[in-house]
Amino acid sequence: MKLSVFRLSYWNRRGSSFRSSPSLDPSFDGKSPSSVFWFVIHGLCCLISLILGFRFSHLVLFFLFSTSVTNLYTTPFLFAGNGGVSQLLRLKPLETATNSTVKKNSRVVVGRHGIRIRPWPHPNPIEVLRAHQLLVRVQKEQKSMYGVRSPRTVIVVTPTYVRTFQALHLTGVMHSLMLVPYDLVWIVVEAGGITNETASFIAKSGLKTIHLGFDQKMPNTWEDRHKLETKMRLHALRVVREKKLDGIVMFADDSNMHSMELFDEIQTVKWFGALSVGILAHSGNADELSSILKNEQGKNKEKPSMPIQGPSCNSSEKLVGWHIFNTQPYAKKTAVYIDEKAPVMPSKMEWSGFVLNSRLLWKESLDDKPAWVKDLSLLDDGYAEIESPLSLVKDPSMVEPLGSCGRRVLLWWLRVEARADSKFPPGWIIKSPLEITVPSKRTPWPDSSSELPAAAIKEAKSNSKPRVSKSKSYKEKQEPKAFDGVKVSATS
């Protein structure tokens, strides 16, 4: 009984103490400024400790788990040996214990990101060679799939003769032929007979060449030169006929310029084809040439005709005629001799704009030979009846137009020659040192004299006039002058 009374009194006292506790500190308020301030300070301290703790933990993880990498580049340098020969030495990294780690993890950490470093920055030459071989193989496969399936041999006929610009013209033609991706035979017909100069020049090409000599010498007039070049081309066709060369015959003059697409286009011809030729009427006097064109435009009140010679087609891509370069505006103003400065005009139909199948020239009769081609046995008789390539066919309308039916110009006709009496070294090869025309302190030939000839020095002195210095002339202008005893000053 006493125990239950004691417990009841204990719980009553405890409940009254809890109820009376707020009244003991009446100044306590949860919304006071001091409590808010301390709450904000507590939050800032928590946030700062969180940031510092994250950063500290990141650094600890970085130092514990990151590997130290040493990047050693092999630096090439030149070292002169005892024999005076430069040798290329390469520095190799030292064999250390960390080499194994370098091979496993070639990574340098900068900030938070890693940079991958190659052991050698330059590509492997063996891999580069394999890549080039793969590209060549791919190009060959593409040509076999999309290009000419069974290409024929290209037979090129070039008439030439020894002159000042022969090396200039033959260099361009030779390098164009060297780039042809098909089998090629180059027939060079030289006027005046075979010379060592021309033979040594065409031998540099490395092509299959047939060097023929022609007895007649090249004349000095353009009209006679066109006729002789026709005979030289027909002489080459006779060789094709006798040797039964199989392929596509094209006529490449030594001064013409050819596009590489031309050699792909002629592979499509079946028997006899024609293409457009750009005519570059050269003239040493540009003002005279422009005046001729203006006069033509003023008379006709139309634009001058395009300087192109080739086939003309209709909307159905069929040959209907020929576009010939109009030479009437240049009447009596064209060059007669080779070394004149007047414009040089082409012949009626240039041979360079035609290609033909070499089987048309064979003596043996072919079953599939077209009937519109003439009997070319006249090649054995003479050259009088043939003036242009169209003389080889009976019906010119059967000629196959090439180059998008003549709309694409794939070669250009140009005639540029030097004076007939101009001097030039044979083959443009200088065997002896040149004469010194301008003295220099250092000359490439120590044995030669560095002084000008006495006659040249006297002529230079006679032509030179004494120069008056600017300061002296200025003083003379500023000095006062006297007129009739009156002294006049230069300044007011």
Curated annotation (Swiss-Prot):
Residues bearing glycans: N99, N196, N314
Location, primary (coarse class): Golgi
EC number of this enzyme: 2.4.2.-
Biased composition (Basic and acidic residues): 473-484
Keywords: Cell wall biogenesis/degradation, Glycoprotein, Glycosyltransferase, Golgi apparatus, Membrane, Signal-anchor, Transferase, Transmembrane, Transmembrane helix
Top EC class of this enzyme: transferase
An example Gene Ontology biological process: cell wall organization
GO cellular component: Golgi apparatus; Golgi membrane
Record topology, Lumenal segments: 55-492
Disulfide-bond pairs as recorded: none
InterPro entries registered for this protein in UniProt: Glyco_trans_43, Nucleotide-diphossugar_trans
Locations listed in the record: Golgi apparatus membrane
Protein's job: Involved in the synthesis of the hemicellulose glucuronoxylan, a major component of secondary cell walls. Probably involved in the elongation of glucuronoxylan xylosyl backbone.
UniProt protein name: Probable beta-1,4-xylosyltransferase IRX14H
Organism of derivation: Arabidopsis thaliana
